Amino acid sequence: CIIHAAPYSHGSGLYMLPHVERGACQVIPASGGFDPDEVFALLRSWKGATFFFAPTMVTRLINAPGLAAADTTNLKTIVYGGAPMYAEDCLKALDLLGPKLVQIYGQGESPMTITALSRAVHTDVGHPRYHARLASVGPAQKGVEVRIADEDDNDLPLGEIGEILVRGDVVMKGYWQNEAATAESLRGGW
């Protein structure tokens, strides 16, 4: 099941689609929002529970006083995204909750499908770049190309700051009845 402690208008709403496809239950907390103690209470009743959390929600969960007494065995996965996750918080969550984390990155024009940091990457502590990988958004998904460009649309070298450009079937085809905005946003298929 998926427990919606995050807004439907963001990742939780989009991430519910694969759960609906599989006939999984959808649980809406009575508070209508995120409360760590309510999450712990819901975990007692729902096996195989998945959540979509912003990184701040993960941080609040792992720092909640109630976590020490909470039974999190029913927690299957926390998918997180929507903002950067501090590597220290990620490590603490892995230590306290076990291998339950998956990170996803998307944009409004290419929702939740650009890059991902898998459960396996989160737990591959022997990798020489383990900590750097935890601080990243992961590799591009299959069928998605990603590049970083400057203001003149030139590719930038690794490590430089620029605009994230995406190409692939997951990218929108255009803005509804707004060709000018489409032409401005989708340049050369990017």
List where the protein language model places each region.
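Conserved AMP-binding/adenylation subdomain of ANL enzymes
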Residues: 1, 9-49, 64
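AMP-binding (ANL) adenylation modules
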Residues: 6-10, 46, 106, 154-155, ...
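Gly/Ser/Thr-rich phosphate-binding loop
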Residues: 21-24, 48-53, 62-132, 145, ...
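Alpha-helix capping/helix-boundary segments
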Residues: 57-58, 85, 171
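Active-site phosphate/pyrophosphate- and oxyanion-stabilizing loops and adjacent acidic/basic residues
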Residues: 91, 135, 180
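Short coil-to-beta-strand transition motifs
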Residues: 136-143
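Conserved ATP-binding/catalytic segment of the ANL
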Residues: 139, 154-159, 163-190
